[in-house]
Amino acid sequence: MKKLFLLVLIIGFVGCKNDKKINRTLPSLDRSELILKYAKGFSVVDYGQYKILKINSPWPKSEKTYTYLLLTKEQAMVSTFNKDDYDAIITIPIEKIVVTSTTHIPALELLGVEQTLVGFPGTDYVSSEKVRGLIDTKKIRELGENEGINTEVLLELNPDLVVGFGIDGNNKTFETIKKSGIPVIYNGDWVEDSPLAKAEWIKFFGVLFNKVAEADSIFNQIEKDYLDAKALASKVTTKPSVLSGAMHKDVWYLPNGTSPEAQLLKDANVNYLYSETTGSGSLALSFESVFEKAKAADLWLSPSYYSSFEALEKANQHYTKFDAFKNKSIYTFVNTTGATGGVLYYELGTTRPDLVLKDLIKICHPELLKDYKPYFFKPLNR
């Protein structure tokens, strides 16, 4: 009987030891998923002791899902996770970051963490006054160009994370950075199919900086303002016809009808002349086909990089035959720039589609939003 008691005691003791080991290595049963209303390109699951971030299709036709383990410093010190199971293990909150697109900067600023940005490729393209101040005081280093980032400077900065973007995943610089031990995450906001889906990527940065609640609150306000503006525009009965884009060499590029840009025009309640088209990427049309369809368009928006009627006419005299040219009804965002020439729309437009939509409503339905001053768009210079 005594031997049986000792045997049970030993089994119980060994079981307790094994249980302790299991508790340190197995995932927690508690889990909550980050709520995303529009974005499809990423997901976050919080297991209490750690988070799993997944990036899906960060560029067109991408077939790989990238998986990242997010741990606090305290959790990282006792972690027994296998690094080979993840594309990277990242310690949060991020204290030093490098981002590679101006579209990433507004999220940092809105979350109040712009001071964590230590390097950027192409600092002249940055328009944000706060971030320009950090650049001017040498707190943010110049890293060259996105496809040829100065890895020597970047490795010297030793950021906790590099947030990149890619069109096909074949970026040798990012591979070099990863091999040095610095994690790289591809941001796929630009692949999303709606303006609000793109804007919701602020929640991606919210997770990285332990500011989930703040990111959620900011996005909710952007969403509300966007939907309120859309509802206001829906009440009008007169819809101006709209042309977009311009020629590049022998091809006229303009948004297809299922693009985020076309969605903005739809929500502004205008007659976008190519709203019925579908497909991925931009439409690529001949001048003749566009002229035939859009010669009498009431408005011409975003005529490529042209900033004035003179520049547009010099590029192609045939542009002058459009009614929108004759009536001086052409609007562009390229004339709204930062101190060093960066186009504000390219930087902020993704995060603030509410402002883009209000700009379009102000232009297309001037009787609405009477006290609103367009943020990005201006009439083409005469």
Which stretches of residues belong to each language-model region?
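Extracytoplasmic substrate-binding proteins
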Residues: 139, 160-163, 170-251, 275-276, ...
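Bacterial Sec-exported substrate-binding components of ABC uptake systems
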Residues: 16-105, 214-243, 309, 326, ...
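A short, gly/pro- and small-residue-rich
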Residues: 114-117, 176-188, 312-331
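Structural recognition of the beta-strand scaffold that forms the well-ordered cores
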Residues: 96-99, 116-120, 161-165, 184-187, ...
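Solvent-exposed, polar/charged alpha-helical surfaces in well-ordered, non-transmembrane soluble domains
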Residues: 95, 105-109, 152-156, 175, ...
